[in-house]
UniProtKB/Swiss-Prot annotation:
PROSITE patterns: PCI. Residues 1-33 have a biased composition (Acidic residues). It comes from the Eukaryota. Residues 331-517 form the PCI domain. This is COP9 signalosome complex subunit 10. Component of the COP9 signalosome (CSN) complex that acts as an regulator of the ubiquitin (Ubl) conjugation pathway by mediating the deneddylation of the cullin subunit of SCF-type E3 ubiquitin-protein ligase complexes. The CSN complex is involved in the regulation of the mating pheromone response. Keywords: Cytoplasm, Nucleus, Signalosome. GO terms for cellular component: COP9 signalosome; cytoplasm. Residues 1-37, 573-594 are annotated as: Disordered.
Length: 643
């Protein structure tokens, strides 16, 4: 019953009572220490330093702690207490450096304090009954001293003004880590030595990135052999980003390493809420994902037939059109996340001018590719593909208004299919054209394709390829080649679109058919020609029956069958010529004159060959059915007589 009443009294105790009890306990502890240590004055100074520390007055607290240490210099039995106080001095420096960079005088004092700390720790080496956890102490000092050294430090976004200060800061902290490595603790406790070695390795790699003749490939190669820490992942991904922005070059065999680093950083963000909430890490992660999609998931021929290349040594591959638009949408989302991370970091345009331009440009280009990417929304893609990207707040309040206006102009040109204005827009965006060349190439391809089939095809029933080259010309000095025009046509044909066309590679012409003629070509021509022959139906009824028999026998429409053997002639008078040749052939066949039969047969097929080679698709007239009838009649007679 006594225990229950005591618990009840403790539960009902007020906060003031608890504070008074804690103060009494602290006073008892201090009185015990004073009684044990002879009531020395250093205890009061130490308590004063702790009070200043709690008040976040770290400069004054450090001075008091140093004064306390000077009182204990001759106290060999209190060497462990001296280590504790010395650690408090270093903790004060860590807090001070969080709010600014050290000047030359402070740097000298910090180095001296760290040297004294290491010497004091070395004095404890071999001492029995040491109650200090030196391994934990070194670990905390290192981790408390290193935070924020990499925050807001981006290789692609660092300016010349920041470069010298960042270099000095990292060089200074490298010196500190080298001092800590001189302690016996690093050799006795492997985990401490490994931690210091990893941090030192990353710092030295960072210092190399500030060199004007830096080799980012060598830096990334030295880091990727043993990736253990978050800082190493950050740096190696930044090396990839900086290398691509500078020279747009990454080796094919680096794709898997890039993917591995991305997966590891993504996993760390998923496992740790503290890491996931860091905007600088998220910026690197999302930009790296967008870069990986552009480099290794998109290809110049992604809007082609969708065939895949197997057995390639490169990670790049052809993808289907459906997969292509999914990748573009993912790339757009990654750039969008980068914009939000930049907003959270509060960066100004002078520090991240080039980096931000690439992010904003990539976002707008992906939106352009997704705009009217298909007549119906592709499965697996969002329904906001046609939302104007400049309606987003991040672009409306972007600090670089001039650059955003340039992007707005190319967006309007693309949507309006103003292909003649595209070249000047590309020149204005030359600053980001190299790193985003793959997206620019896709934009140029799409505006040509949509111009061809949205504005040219509905207007022109027949147009030459040379005229198409002029109408689809982006660069005034370099028109598209004939092969490029044919590639546009063949890809469109393979995608099973609504507009049908007929390609004449001899005359280099393209004949377009409207959407209502989406049925096969021979059916459309058959219906049109039949209407033209309606007035002559009575005169050719017998011939028509023969042609229908041939059509049924060969399971082909008459026009298609005639075209298959190449007899579509443009001259009306060729009808009588073909008829006389047919009768001549029939007479020789019936008379069984082998020589005459062979000569006339050769002459007949020479005529067919000549007709095919000189055929002009735009001059097809009503004589086609008579020609088809006469030719097939002659072939039928030849076949019967030979049997």
């Amino acid at each position: 019953m006594t225990d229950e009443s005591d618990n009840y009294n403790d539960f009902m105790m007020s906060d003031e009572d608890m504070d008074s009890i804690e103060m009494e306990d602290e006073e008892n502890d201090v009185e015990g220490d004073e009684g044990q240590r002879g009531g020395q004055e250093w205890v009061q100074n130490y308590e004063q330093g702790l009070s200043l520390w709690n008040d976040e007055n770290y400069v004054a607290a450090r001075q008091v702690f140093l004064k306390t240490l000077s009182m204990l210099v001759s106290e060999e039995e209190l060497i462990e207490m001296r280590c504790k106080i010395h650690r408090q001095v270093l903790e004060c420096w860590c807090k001070i450096l969080m709010y600014g960079e050290p000047d030359n005088e402070q740097s000298t004092e910090i180095i001296a304090d760290f040297r004294n700390f290491v010497e004091l720790v070395n004095e404890l080496h071999g001492k029995a009954n040491c109650s200090l956890d030196l391994s934990s102490m070194f670990h905390h000092v290192t981790m408390d001293f290193m935070p924020n050294i990499y925050d807001r430090t981006f290789i692609p976004g660092i300016t010349d003004d920041e470069e010298s200060s960042k270099w000095a800061k990292m060089t200074f902290k490298t010196t500190i880590l080298q001092i800590l490595q001189g302690s016996w603790v690093c050799h006795t406790f492997p985990e401490v030595g490994l931690l210091l070695q990893q941090e030192l390795h990353v710092l030295q790699a960072w210092i190399k990135t500030f060199d004007k003749e830096r080799d980012l490939y060598a830096i990334s190669e030295s880091l990727r052999k043993d990736i253990n820490t978050l800082n190493e992942l950050q740096l190696i991904l930044q090396c990839y980003i900086a290398r691509y922005i500078e020279d747009q070059h990454l080796l094919c065999n680096e794709g898997e390493v890039f993917r591995m680093c991305l997966n590891q950083l993504d996993q760390k963000c998923n496992e740790s809420l503290a890491v996931a909430q860091r905007s600088d890490i998220n910026l690197i992660l999302h930009f790296s994902k967008a870069l990986f999609l552009i480099l290794f998931e998109l290809d110049q021929d992604d809007l082609g037939d969708g065939n895949k290349v197997t057995g390639s040594t490169c990670v790049r591959r052809f993808v289907t059109i459906h997969k292509f638009y999914q990748n573009i949408e993912c790339c757009k989302e990654e750039f969008w996340e980068c914009l939000k991370n930049l907003e959270e970091l509060g960066t100004n345009k002078f520090r991240f001018e080039r980096f931000m331009q690439i992010i904003v440009g990539g976002f707008v280009l992906c939106a352009m590719i997704m705009h009217r990417g298909s007549q119906t929304r592709l499965a697996g893609t969002s329904g906001n593909a046609d939302i104007n990207p400049f309606d987003y707040e991040q672009l409306r309040i972007a600090p670089d208004h001039i650059f955003v206006d340039k992007l707005r102009r190319i967006y309007d040109v693309f949507v309006g299919l103003q292909i003649q204005e595209m070249h000047s827009c590309l020149i204005e965006l030359e600053c980001i054209r190299a790193p985003l060349s793959r997206l620019f190439d896709q934009v140029c391809y799409l505006i040509q394709k949509r111009k061809l089939f949205s504005e040219i095809a509905p207007i022109y029933s027949c147009i030459s390829i040379q005229d198409l080259r002029q109408k689809l010309q982006i660069d005034p000095s370099v028109p598209p080649t004939r092969d490029e025009i044919l590639v546009h046509l063949m890809r469109y044909c393979m995608q099973d679109r609504g507009i049908n066309f007929k390609l004449d590679l001899v005359a280099d012409t393209v004949t377009f058919y409207s959407e209502q003629h989406s049925e096969p070509l021979h059916d459309a021509v058959f219906s049109e020609t039949r209407m033209g022959h309606k007035s002559h139906k009575s005169s050719i009824s017998k011939d028509r029956a023969i042609v229908e028999d041939i059509k049924a026998a060969h399971e082909m429409p008459e026009v298609e069958y005639a075209h298959d053997i190449g007899i579509l002639e443009s001259q009306v008078d060729s009808q009588s010529h073909s008829k006389s040749n047919t009768k001549s052939m029939s007479r020789h066949v019936s008379g069984h004159d082998p020589d005459s039969f062979g000569q006339d047969t050769i002459s007949f097929f020479d005529t067919l060959r000549l007709a095919r080679e000189t055929y002009q698709g735009s001059n097809i007239d009503n004589s086609v059915y008579t020609i088809a009838k006469l030719t097939n009649e002659a072939l039928q007679e030849i076949s019967n007589d030979v049997r």
